[in-house]
Amino acid sequence: MFKEYKIYKFFEQVKQEAYKVVWPTKKELTASTLVVIVAVFVFSLICLVLDYGIHNIIQILLNIGK
């Protein structure tokens, strides 16, 4: 019985904390989403450039001996 009470108490506290959650406004959510999309795009471009550069360097090094 004591164990069941602890579980009940836990879920009551979860419910109380859920009421304290402050959700972002539509404007904040849109701005945050845009920041994430731009950041992913920029980091993807950086990875693309680095990958292309490393690929070319390796190709040059492999072709030196030929």
UniProtKB/Swiss-Prot annotation:
Q: One GO term of the cellular component aspect?
A: plasma membrane
InterPro entries in the record, alphabetically?
SecE_bac, SecE_sf, Translocase_SecE/Sec61-g
Concerning PROSITE patterns, the annotation shows: SECE_SEC61G
Superkingdom of this protein's organism? Bacteria
Main localization, broad class: membrane
In this record, what's one Pfam family?
Answer: SecE
- Keyword line: Cell inner membrane, Cell membrane, Membrane, Protein transport, Translocation, Transmembrane, Transmembrane helix, Transport
Which molecular function GO terms apply here? protein transmembrane transporter activity
User: Where does the chain cross the membrane?
Assistant: 34-54
List the membrane topology term(s): Single-pass membrane protein
> So what does this one do?
Essential subunit of the Sec protein translocation channel SecYEG. Clamps together the 2 halves of SecY. May contact the channel plug during translocation.
Subunit details for this protein? Answer: Component of the Sec protein translocase complex. Heterotrimer consisting of SecY, SecE and SecG subunits. The heterotrimers can form oligomers, although 1 heterotrimer is thought to be able to translocate proteins. Interacts with the ribosome. Interacts with SecDF, and other proteins may be involved. Interacts with SecA.
Protein name, entry field: Protein translocase subunit SecE
Species per Swiss-Prot/TrEMBL record: Rickettsia bellii (strain RML369-C)
